[in-house]
């Protein structure tokens, strides 16, 4: 079965064709990141306009790269939640137009569930497992027992980890997006030269995260370090920041693995391309970790089309009333049953 997936949840416009859930025939992405650099973050209005400019191109290229025509597509799939509403509308409108004009079925999927699926594209993973989703908009620990179904165990109470990277990079005038820049600088830095706090919440928040304090500490502590003559170079700041940003992810994931007895863990989301994070989890002796290929860490439509193959018999197909949502329909437990 050939499925054409579309994702326009944030600032990347993507289309992909996947056969039988795992055989990626094509995966095309158009990034609008250059248009957002001067603003040091994603501007929703600009993102939506860039999607309009790119959507037909990425769909057409995905078909050509897969040596496939629209008539060969058995099912269309699109993310309709969560994300920027203006961005989501472009993908949903395009998918609806294609599906209904060709009289083909359409599935609406959860963007988070698609990220959770991304390691499945290159790994054979047994259920249950713990999925850590880390990006500029999300920092979530979930327990996964089946495709498209996940229970949120912990989330961020303020900034997402990727957002913290961007804000620290902005403070240091390093550029946007901050994640790749800080990751690169950290490799040249001394993580022991300066220290930032590792924030670990307890009690009812034992599996939740907080990154606003780390961001503030980087701003004020760095100024203090510079005054007191510490080696607060950009490289050392980046190395110290990475430790404080990544360690809570590992510690809390391990803590939930021990509590639940689940010893399989997956990483997904844009921050999953971070080299220190991949090494920390990938080399773990505490649990078995499955990593997505680097090309499937950021937003992409291959993960959408792949998940759709497994969801086609589990949820209703979408109709003309398909809408978009900025948030996950049910924060605590998502079963993908209500896609409309």
UniProtKB/Swiss-Prot annotation:
EC number, as in UniProt: 2.3.1.234
**GO biological process: one example:** tRNA threonylcarbamoyladenosine modification
A GO CC annotation given for this chain: cytoplasm
Q: According to its UniProt record, which reaction does this protein catalyse? A: L-threonylcarbamoyladenylate + adenosine(37) in tRNA = N(6)-L-threonylcarbamoyladenosine(37) in tRNA + AMP + H(+)
Q: Which PROSITE patterns match?
A: GLYCOPROTEASE
Q: Please state where this protein is localized.
A: Cytoplasm
Instruction: Detail the disulphide connectivity of this chain as listed in its UniProt entry.
Output: none
Looking at the keywords, is Acyltransferase present?
yes
Keyword field: Acyltransferase, Cytoplasm, Iron, Metal-binding, Transferase, tRNA processing
Binding of substrate occurs at 133-137, 166, 179, 183, 274
A molecular function annotated in GO for this UniProt entry is: N(6)-L-threonylcarbamoyladenine synthase activity
Name any cofactors this protein relies on: Fe(2+)
Give the cofactor note: Binds 1 Fe(2+) ion per subunit.
Q: Which domain of life is it from?
A: Bacteria
Q: Name one Pfam family in it.
A: TsaD
Binding residues for Fe cation: 111, 115, 299
| Family, similarity comment | Belongs to the KAE1 / TsaD family.
Query: What is the protein's known function?
Result: Required for the formation of a threonylcarbamoyl group on adenosine at position 37 (t(6)A37) in tRNAs that read codons beginning with adenine. Is involved in the transfer of the threonylcarbamoyl moiety of threonylcarbamoyl-AMP (TC-AMP) to the N6 group of A37, together with TsaE and TsaB. TsaD likely plays a direct catalytic role in this reaction.
What name has this protein been given in UniProt?
A: tRNA N6-adenosine threonylcarbamoyltransferase
User: Which species is listed as the source?
Assistant: Brachyspira hyodysenteriae (strain ATCC 49526 / WA1)
């Amino acid at each position: 079965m050939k499925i054409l997936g579309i994702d326009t949840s944030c600032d990347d416009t993507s289309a992909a064709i996947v056969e039988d859930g795992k055989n990626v025939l094509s995966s095309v992405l158009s990034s609008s990141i250059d248009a957002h650099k001067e603003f040091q973050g994603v501007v929703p209005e600009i993102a939506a306009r860039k999607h309009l400019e790119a959507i037909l191109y990425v769909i057409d290229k995905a078909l050509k790269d897969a040596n496939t025509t629209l008539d060969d597509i058995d099912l269309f799939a699109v993310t309709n939640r969560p994300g920027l509403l203006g961005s989501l509308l472009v993908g949903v409108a395009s998918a609806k137009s294609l599906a209904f004009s060709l009289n083909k079925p359409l599935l609406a999927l959860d963007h988070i569930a698609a990220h959770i699926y991304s390691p499945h594209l290159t790994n054979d993973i047994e259920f249950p497992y713990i999925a850590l989703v880390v990006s500029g908009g999300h920092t979530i620990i979930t327990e996964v027992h089946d495709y498209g179904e996940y229970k949120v165990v912990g989330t961020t109470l303020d900034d997402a980890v990727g957002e913290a990277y961007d804000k620290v990079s902005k403070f240091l005038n390093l550029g946007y997006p901050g994640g790749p820049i800080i990751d690169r600088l950290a490799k040249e830095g001394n993580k022991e030269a300066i220290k930032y706090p590792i924030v670990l919440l307890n009690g009812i928040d034992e599996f939740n995260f907080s990154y606003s304090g780390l961001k503030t500490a980087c701003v004020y502590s760095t100024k203090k370090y510079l005054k007191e003559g510490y080696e607060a170079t950009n490289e050392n700041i980046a190395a110290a920041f990475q430790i404080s940003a990544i360690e809570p992810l590992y510690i809390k994931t391990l803590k939930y693995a021990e509590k639940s007895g689940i010893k399989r863990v997956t990483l997904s989301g844009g921050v999953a391309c971070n080299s220190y994070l991949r090494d920390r989890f990938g080399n773990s002796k505490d649990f078995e970790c499955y990593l997505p290929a680097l090309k499937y860490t950021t937003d992409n439509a291959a993960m959408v089309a792949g998940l759709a193959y497994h969801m086609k018999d589990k949820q209703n197909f979408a109709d003309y009333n398909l809408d978009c949502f900025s948030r996950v329909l049910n924060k605590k437990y998502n079963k993908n049953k209500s896609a409309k």
